[in-house]
């Protein structure tokens, strides 16, 4: 075992002495040591319950003959960090979490790992760390939040964000907004729609690193504890047979993950995260690969923010296993991929059926023949851009409008709320990319304000930043290269015509080639003054969004 290096031999007496101080007994030495990577934190609703949630996991690890050692990573609540300076730290936290996993597992030579994430950057950060250290690992997330209710109507966090826009327009009162605020988030868990956190938790199942049900079983459902206990037993079994993440996760696993993500209309952030996770697995994956899958994969689900269905509905309809089964049945999925259960996905979904075809549609009744996420290229995005098509109204799939440019999220919010943005505009928000932000902030406040003010069917938004999984509308993000790196989004001027053509995967600045070349040659990117030493380091080493916004010293 890996941990023999800290347990066995007379020369390890100092190590054992320290372990005894942590509660190890004579009979514990020689047993596998399982790292329990928790992410409990008091200010993130998806994580507030994880202090108690971890206890049965540790109990089951002990029963299975191993020793659990719990440690914690940090966590950021993107909703609380949204719309202000704090969002600069959200995406960078992913790298800190991956590094924390590596640091603890390698420093103590742990034999196995059970990861307990839940929210936006914690899931991909832990996935990156787990694939990097490559010890037997199982993921068991904290589970989705229940949807809120006002009368018979379901509400969620996006209802609150959009309510701010409605109040700004005069459609609702402050009292109405307070009622939404008080009812939108009724329990612990990751926010109740198919936003980034739940999208990523669902994809742990597809990648084979999470047990069936991990992505959709609610945090408050008693089955969540049963799943946690099963995960704890399973990680000990994986250590015994030495089945590691890189034995499970292959190029085909990522093909599967993108297919499911695209079929269910997951968050656009999954593109960024899966590219980064693939790199940690030693797998080359490109935006062009995602584009190909998107063109072949139909949209089978529309979950909030794209509809009134929520994660409890998706779970009731059969969950991720039912989506995988429908794709497999139609030759769009590789069922031979292994999982932490030691079974293949094909074996897992063999007896699964769709229980509600309104929530998960059959392929012959799909919402569209191509997927809920699309990659757009063009002179504005030579390396690609991302749009969640499942959240775009039909009349906005092809849109030509005049640019109105903002060089920060704050400027854009002020302009939208101040009435500068009119029907027919394409809002351009730049210098919000990985380097330019730095930190590639989410533009949920601008997009939800546009929707709340009733402009969602007449205004588009493009950015080198990214979006919350709760964003809907004609919103194109991850534009690469970004403005701070000299990308063409930096040369757009107010009044320029921009073409968004989602069916044909195009994003174009409609000026002459001569004018385009002249502007690009003369363009000198701005650089924001950043005081934080961490964000300065991040800006120096972060790569393009088309590469997953990873950190690299190469």
From Swiss-Prot:
Its EC number is 4.2.1.9. The active site is at 468 (proton acceptor). Keywords: 2Fe-2S, Amino-acid biosynthesis, Branched-chain amino acid biosynthesis, Iron, Iron-sulfur, Lyase, Magnesium, Metal-binding. The modification N6-carboxylysine is found at residue 121. Pfam families: ILV_EDD_C, ILVD_EDD_N. One of its GO terms (molecular function) is dihydroxy-acid dehydratase activity. Pathway: Amino-acid biosynthesis; L-isoleucine biosynthesis; L-isoleucine from 2-oxobutanoate: step 3/4; Amino-acid biosynthesis; L-valine biosynthesis; L-valine from pyruvate: step 3/4. One of its GO terms (cellular component) is cytosol. Functions in the biosynthesis of branched-chain amino acids. Catalyzes the dehydration of (2R,3R)-2,3-dihydroxy-3-methylpentanoate (2,3-dihydroxy-3-methylvalerate) into 2-oxo-3-methylpentanoate (2-oxo-3-methylvalerate) and of (2R)-2,3-dihydroxy-3-methylbutanoate (2,3-dihydroxyisovalerate) into 2-oxo-3-methylbutanoate (2-oxoisovalerate), the penultimate precursor to L-isoleucine and L-valine, respectively. Homodimer. This is Dihydroxy-acid dehydratase. It comes from Hydrogenobaculum sp. (strain Y04AAS1). The gene is ilvD.
């Amino acid at each position: 075992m890996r941990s023999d290096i800290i347990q066995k031999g007379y020369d390890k007496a100092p190590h054992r002495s320290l372990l005894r101080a942590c509660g190890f007994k004579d009979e514990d030495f020689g047993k596998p040591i399982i790292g329990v990577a928790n992410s409990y934190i008091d200010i993130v609703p998806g994580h507030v319950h994880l202090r108690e949630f971890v206890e049965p996991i540790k109990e089951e690890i002990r029963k299975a003959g191993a020793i659990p050692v719990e440690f914690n990573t940090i966590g950021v609540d993107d909703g609380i960090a949204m719309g202000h300076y704090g969002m600069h730290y959200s995406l960078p936290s992913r790298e800190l979490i991956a590094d924390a996993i590596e640091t603890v597992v390698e420093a103590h030579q742990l034999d196995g790992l059970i990861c307990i994430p839940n929210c936006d950057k914690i899931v991909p950060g832990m996935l990156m760390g787990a694939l990097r250290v490559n010890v037997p690992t199982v993921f068991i997330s904290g589970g989705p939040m229940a949807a809120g209710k006002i009368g018979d109507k379901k509400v969620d966090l996006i209802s609150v964000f959009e309510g701010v826009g409605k109040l700004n327009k005069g459609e609702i009162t402050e009292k109405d907004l307070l009622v939404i605020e008080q009812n939108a988030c009724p329990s612990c868990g990751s926010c109740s729609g198919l936003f980034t956190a739940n999208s990523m938790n669902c994809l742990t199942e597809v990648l084979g690193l999470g047990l069936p049900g991990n992505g959709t079983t609610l945090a408050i459902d008693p089955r969540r504890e049963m799943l946690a206990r099963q995960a704890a037993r399973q990680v000990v079994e994986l250590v015994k047979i030495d089945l590691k993440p890189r034995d499970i996760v292959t190029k085909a696993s990522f093909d599967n993950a993108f297919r499911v993500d695209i079929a269910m209309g997951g968050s656009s952030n999954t593109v960024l995260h899966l590219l980064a996770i693939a790199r940690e697995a030693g797998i080359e994956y490109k935006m062009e690969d995602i584009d190909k899958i998107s063109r072949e994969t139909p949209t089978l689900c529309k979950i909030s923010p794209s509809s009134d269905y929520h994660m409890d509905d998706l779970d009731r309809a059969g969950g991720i296993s039912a989506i995988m089964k429908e794709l497999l049945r139609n030759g769009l999925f590789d069922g031979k991929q292994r999982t932490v259960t030691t079974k293949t996905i094909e074996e897992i979904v063999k007896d699964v059926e769709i229980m509600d075809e309104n929530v998960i549609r059959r392929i012959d009744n799909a919402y569209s023949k191509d997927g809920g996420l699309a990659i757009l290229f063009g002179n504005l995005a030579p390396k690609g851009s991302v749009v969640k098509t499942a959240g775009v109204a039909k009349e906005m799939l092809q849109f030509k409008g005049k640019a109105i440019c903002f060089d920060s999220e704050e400027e854009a919010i002020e302009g939208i709320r101040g009435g500068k943005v009119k029907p027919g505009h394409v809002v351009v928000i730049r210098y919000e990319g990985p380097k330019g932000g730095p930190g590639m902030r989410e533009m949920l406040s601008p997009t939800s304000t546009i929707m709340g003010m009733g402009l969602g069917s007449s205004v588009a938004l493009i950015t080198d930043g990214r979006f919350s999984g709760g964003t809907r509308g004609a919103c194109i993000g991850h534009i690469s290269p970004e403005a701070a790196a000299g990308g063409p989004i930096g040369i757009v001027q107010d009044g320029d015509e921009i073409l968004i053509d989602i069916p044909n995967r195009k994003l174009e600045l409609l000026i002459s080639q001569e004018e385009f070349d002249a502007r690009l040659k003369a363009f000198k990117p701005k650089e924001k003054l950043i005081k934080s030493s961490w964000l300065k380091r991040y800006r120096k080493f972060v790569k393009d969004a088309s590469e997953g916004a990873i950190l690299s010293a190469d």
